[in-house]
């Protein structure tokens, strides 16, 4: 009887925890994320995307964001997490007087993307998260 209760309790825990893991996704970048945010003047260049000549390197910046998962789906939640992370990245660039962040990479834990078309995001039933890294730079203006 006692063994049956223990096995039943263990089975209940396993069933409730099934499917609760975080999924690492590759999500398409929206074209709007690369444009300077209103008032920031900081452009973003993902991966090896071409950009104007670098006048000055100002170091690196790494930021992350985690948002509650909304009802509109995993990709939309990842987009919101990326938007928040990029806002933080732009703020770090402004603080150092940079007008761009180049070589932008995204990651979730050890899964990293250096792409100009996709980004990496971790999404669970409750949240979405992304980390962003890039080189702060002053680019020549045209």
Where is each model-derived feature located?
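Post-signal peptide N-terminal segment of mature Sec-exported envelope proteins
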Residues: 29-52
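A short, structured loop/turn motif at beta-sheet edges
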Residues: 49-55, 92-101, 139-142
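Short, well-ordered alpha-helical segments
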Residues: 63-112
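Charged, often glycine-rich, active-site loop that binds/positions anionic groups
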Residues: 112-124
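C-terminal edge-of-domain segments
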Residues: 124-142
